[in-house]
Design a protein with these regions (language model features):
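Bacterial N-terminal signal peptides that target proteins for export
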Residues: 1-7
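Conserved N-terminal structural module of periplasmic/extracytoplasmic solute-binding proteins
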Residues: 8-9, 13, 22-125, 343, ...
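Hinge/lid segment of periplasmic solute-binding proteins
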Residues: 32-55, 97, 119-173, 203, ...
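Short helices/loops that flank or line small-molecule/ion binding pockets
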Residues: 100-113, 130, 183, 206-211, ...
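Extracytoplasmic/periplasmic substrate-recognition and gating elements
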Residues: 306-371
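Long, aromatic- and glycine/proline-rich binding clefts that accommodate carbohydrate-like moieties
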Residues: 350, 363-392
Length: 392
């Protein structure tokens, strides 16, 4: 089955469904056990930060890019490379609800201005127009082999002839997690096997949920699905609810394929297959065996939000449209905006390159995989490969 990526920036053109702030719920920041550290070799392909340059960059965000060593966390590959080149990251913590206001206040006051800030959909063009960021062309050469394969994407973030976003990587936006023990107990087909055979589609997903819910004991309420899945289901058609030809927008809501997807979602809702509550994370969603699928980003199913030793949880992509051979995945783009007022040019350049190298070099990607599996010992290699397949 062919897999095509759809950047998360295009989600607005596909659906009006929204999701609560990712990462805001769960206990992934606590109870972390010491994990085995993975050795990461240095690279000669990235220059060290000059001795006379500012070597520390300030990161403003809702999470720390540095590991919490008191909790036994390992460094990311990119942080290891950055430290080896003389760089350090200073963390300024902000809440999800206040991050944009605090960034704007820092820029306006020119006090404690962060050097980098996570790319999100508001960054371009809205926040660029507010003069919150500076172009990256002075520190990123998109003709360089390290950056060449993201140039097309970077060209979508040009204003006034300048690039404002340097894409680091693309990661699957959502996956469906389920409990294999529940699947086996109900005598249902294994979704992962269906996925491997190219048969994981709307039809068997719907049938599976219907059977699971209808077989509930008299005193038990069951649901087929919870989380953020509506947008992704529509995207499996390969169509958008609004078309843009480079000059004008046109309404595409009456496209027959869009209508098929919407009818499917209507049936899923009408037949009470959806638990519409905010359950927070996979651990909460799957704990009692009365929900078949939990659909959310990997943040909600890893770390302390993920499976425990006794769990047999698995993951699959959002089921595909049975009327097409293509598989479309919403892809979240990782990038760091260079904040207006930052003077750490050389250090930010180095950070960008370390991040990009960590996500493109095969050895470093293998290091990253090992770190992930060490931190998530109840994720199997097959589960990790689903992430890779849907992110590539």
């Amino acid at each position: 089955m062919k897999i095509k990526k759809i950047l998360a920036l295009a989600v607005a053109l596909t659906s009006v469904f929204a999701v609560a702030g990712c990462g805001s719920t769960g206990d992934s920041s606590s109870k972390v056990s010491t994990v085995k550290k993975v050795k990461v070799e240095d690279t000669q392909e990235i220059e060290a930060i000059p001795d006379d340059a500012q070597k520390t960059i300030r990161w403003m965000g809702t999470y720390d890019l540095n590991p919490n060593e008191k909790k036994g966390e390992d460094k990311s590959v990119e942080m290891t490379l950055f430290n080896n080149k003389g760089g350090k990251v200073e963390y300024t913590r902000v809440t999800d609800s206040e991050k944009f206001d605090q960034l704007a206040s820092a820029i306006m006051a020119q006090q404690n201005v962060p050097d980098i800030f996570k790319y999100e959909w508001m960054a371009f063009p809205a926040q660029v127009l507010k003069d919150m960021y500076q172009p990256v062309d002075d520190i990123v050469n998109f003709d360089d082999p390290l950056w060449a394969d993201v140039k097309t994407t970077a060209d979508k973030f040009v204003m006034g002839g300048k690039h404002y976003v340097a894409p680091i990587s693309f990661t699957v936006g959502t996956l469906m997690m389920y409990d294999q023990d529940v699947i086996d107990a109900e005598g249902l087909d294994d979704p992962y096997e269906l996925y491997q055979n190219g048969e994981w589609n709307w039809d068997n997903w719907y049938d599976m949920m219907s059977e699971f819910v209808s077989n509930a004991p008299a005193d038990v309420e069951r649901f087929g699905i919870n989380g953020w899945f509506q947008t992704q289901v529509i995207q499996q058609t390969g169509k958008t609810m609004v078309n843009y030809d480079g000059e004008k927008f046109t309404n595409n809501i009456n496209d027959p394929d869009i209508e098929r997807a919407e009818d499917l979602l209507y049936q899923v809702g009408k037949n009470n297959l959806v638990n519409g509550n905010w359950l927070g994370n996979a651990k909460q969603a799957l704990k009692d065996g009365n929900l078949l699928f939990y659909c959310m980003g990997t943040w909600a199913m890893t770390g302390n939000n993920g499976p425990s030793d006794a769990d047999t949880w698995r993951v699959v992509p959002v089921p595909s449209d049975p009327n097409t051979d293509e598989k479309y995945m919403t892809s979240d783009m990782t990038a760091y905006m260079w904040v207006r007022g930052s003077t750490a040019k050389e250090a930010v350049k180095c950070w960008y390159e370390c991040c990009r190298m960590a996500n493109t070099d095969e050895t470093y990607k293998e290091n990253g995989k090992e770190k992930f599996l060490n931190a998530n010992p109840n994720w199997t290699e097959d589960m990790y490969q689903v992430i890779v397949d849907c992110s590539s």
